[in-house]
Amino acid sequence: MRALISVSDKEGVVEFAKGLEQLGWQIVSTGGTYKILNENGVKAVEVAQITQSPEMFEGRVKTLHPKIHGGILYKRDDASHVAQAKEFGIEGIDLVCVNLYPFKETTIRTDDFDEIIENIDIGGPAMVRSAAKNFKDVLIVTSVLDYDEILQRLKEGTDDLEFRRNLMIKAYEHTASYDATIANYMNERFKGGFGDARFIFGNKVFDTRYGENPHQKGALYEFEYFFTNNFRALKGEASFNNMTDINGAVMLATSFENAPVVAIVKHSNPCGLAVKDSLLESYVEALKCDPISAYGGVVAINGTLDRALARKINEIYVEVIIAANVDDDALAVFENKKRIKIFTQDNKFLVRAGDKFDFKHIDGGFVFQERDVVSDDELKNMKQMSKKHANENQLKDAQIAWKVAALTKSNCVVYVKDGAMVAIGMGMTSRVDAARAAVAKAKELDLDLHGCVLASEAFFPFRDSIDIASKVGVKCVIEPGGSIRDDEVIEAANEHGMSLYFTGVRHFLH
């Protein structure tokens, strides 16, 4: 039996090759892999000895040869294939171990296009695809994580068809994602990311018990190993809906750099947020906005969950806590709470993945766009449209309200006072209804909106929302502007003695 080993990632390859040798396999290898194997006592045969053809064009051509691909592809149970292999002096290759040139890593490390091009693997994907096509006869190995299991199965004789089929699937996933990465990179470099095709792929992190509803299957996939590196379960398992809520909560909590932010989310909608002097104070103030909706919600903590904060959260039922870090004694507080789920990023503060693009599934396809981000320039360059100036505290609240509004389902309005969200209306078909809903909820909870700041993610089409805001004591309004009735909105703000600022940037969220 012969194994062809040609890998860019050399981790574990010596041990794997030695394991194969101990089982009686002959090792065939190329270039750097051949060198490291021989230096470590593996009696490998160089590919050039088999092909009788040297590496060409600075290593661009090594394994693209009938004696390699023929040895991989011929069917062992087809007499004509066996006869042809014998006729042309082609010996079988029964295992192919290949991982590919580090294209993605090269694009991160350098912008040198010549170097990037040289890290596009040609022979590697060809061998992987050949071996995967003939998976019944050839084991295809593309992951370091599979080395031990393959050796064990070969030793036991349990490398059955199902196992080989699973390796085949993994191999095609490997080459497909590799080619997609190259295509997306070229697209982004030369066409701004919006070429004729766009490839979206991820690696599975875990299956969820079900999808959005019990009759649907679900799973979490990741880009660039984000969750592998930044998500750990401390208590319980995340559901599909948990992950979408966690995403919304983390996006909110990470909108204010390293500030001690606590965000509370229910069904991906914010129902509480505060930026105070401590995480404990932020949680207490965030909860006041809508304690009814917070029941069974998701709490995101931009910092460490300590015992004091844990005890406060434990006074009500929340389903999920996601924190940058969690103290051991804080975790112990929830020891007897069976239903709560606790996750950490194991970081000092919560982090985002920094995805550059966003997409939404629609029936028959998807729409694709650049990710919406609130830039600092929007707030630095906002224009005062009213006669009255906002004071320093109001400007701070305007920043919070504006960032929350940008992450809230349209149409929305957000009311913030003293660093805490005090009312919110979202997902409404008219903006004035969002304003009315927010005020009604605040009155129901006996929350004082006097002196607060109002933000809207899109322009106010009429002055009616400003008139409603004035009745509850709003003192400052921030919105994009851009309505044909902006003059009426400005007039209303001046009539009610409000300060009004236009950012010039809309942040619809659907």
Swiss-Prot record:
Pathway: Purine metabolism; IMP biosynthesis via de novo pathway; 5-formamido-1-(5-phospho-D-ribosyl)imidazole-4-carboxamide from 5-amino-1-(5-phospho-D-ribosyl)imidazole-4-carboxamide (10-formyl THF route): step 1/1; Purine metabolism; IMP biosynthesis via de novo pathway; IMP from 5-formamido-1-(5-phospho-D-ribosyl)imidazole-4-carboxamide: step 1/1. It catalyses: (6R)-10-formyltetrahydrofolate + 5-amino-1-(5-phospho-beta-D-ribosyl)imidazole-4-carboxamide = 5-formamido-1-(5-phospho-D-ribosyl)imidazole-4-carboxamide + (6S)-5,6,7,8-tetrahydrofolate; IMP + H2O = 5-formamido-1-(5-phospho-D-ribosyl)imidazole-4-carboxamide. GO terms for biological process: 'de novo' IMP biosynthetic process. GO terms for cellular component: cytosol. SMART domains: AICARFT_IMPCHas (SM00798), MGS (SM00851). Residues 1-142 form the MGS-like domain. Its EC number is 2.1.2.3, 3.5.4.10. Keywords: Hydrolase, Multifunctional enzyme, Purine biosynthesis, Transferase. The keyword Transferase applies. It comes from the Bacteria. Coiled coil: none annotated. InterPro entries: AICAR_Tfase_dup_dom_sf, Cytidine_deaminase-like, MGS-like_dom, MGS-like_dom_sf, PurH-like. GO terms for molecular function: IMP cyclohydrolase activity; phosphoribosylaminoimidazolecarboxamide formyltransferase activity. PROSITE patterns: MGS. Belongs to the PurH family. PANTHER family: BIFUNCTIONAL PURINE BIOSYNTHESIS PROTEIN ATIC, BIFUNCTIONAL PURINE BIOSYNTHESIS PROTEIN PURH. The IMP cyclohydrolase activity resides in the N-terminal region. This is Bifunctional purine biosynthesis protein PurH. It comes from Campylobacter curvus (strain 525.92).
